A protein has these predicted regions:
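Short, glycine/serine-rich, charged loops/turns that create anion-binding
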Residues: 18, 55-57, 115, 155-158
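Extreme N-terminal starter segment of soluble prokaryotic enzymes
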Residues: 4-10
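Short acidic, Gly/Ser-rich segments with clustered Asp/Glu that frequently serve as metal-coordination loops
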Residues: 16-23
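Short glycine-enriched, charge-decorated loop/helix-capping segments at active-site entrances
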Residues: 24-32, 124-128
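Conserved beta-strand elements of the Class I
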Residues: 10-12, 150
Length: 163
């Protein structure tokens, strides 16, 4: 595949956080998730802009599983929650942090998602499950003339896929 000029390309690192690695085994670990930093850094070399998204959750989130609500069981009554999850990516914890090898200062734009207790978005472009409340990522890319986005990250079945 022929890539356009670098000025039209952005690299988007999606949820490359410890919460999705064996570093945090009680959260949502992805096997070898802590080893992807070199590849994310390599793909960023093709781009003029680098973006990141991070889950940024509260300890009071309504979707956190517990003794009465097992992980992956449905939630009703909240339009921006679908299922229960183990606590993960809690702000101020090791799980919230980027995986080793990623430099927070290297990013031109960051999306923090899931801050509200009654929302658990998966993709990095919208704060809600109906894709109506923008995070600003699409607008940021558009105003910089970006036509191609190279995506990589963790939780490919939810977060990367929905981005």
């Amino acid at each position: 595949m022929q890539l356009p000029e670098k000025k039209y390309i952005a690299s988007f690192d999606i949820d490359a956080q410890n919460t999705f690695t064996p570093v945090c085994p009680d959260e949502l670990p992805v096997a070898e998730g802590d080893t992807i930093a070199p590849e994310l850094n390599a793909q960023a070399q093709f781009a003029s802009l680098r973006l990141a998204s991070r889950d940024a959750h509260s300890r009071c989130a309504l979707w956190i599983s517990d003794a009465e609500h097992a992980p992956l069981t449905p939630i009703s009554g909240y339009p921006d929650l679908d299922i229960h999850w183990p606590a993960h990516a809690i702000i101020g914890t090791k799980g919230f942090d980027f995986i080793d090898g990623l430099d927070e200062a290297a990013y031109n734009y960051q999306v923090f998602k899931g801050i509200e207790a009654d929302k658990h978005p998966y993709g990095a472009c919208y704060h809600d499950l109906k894709d109506t409340l923008s995070t600003g990522a699409i607008e940021y890319l558009s105003c910089h003339g970006i036509t191609t986005v190279i995506c990589g990250g963790l939780a490919t079945d939810y977060c990367v896929k929905n981005t």
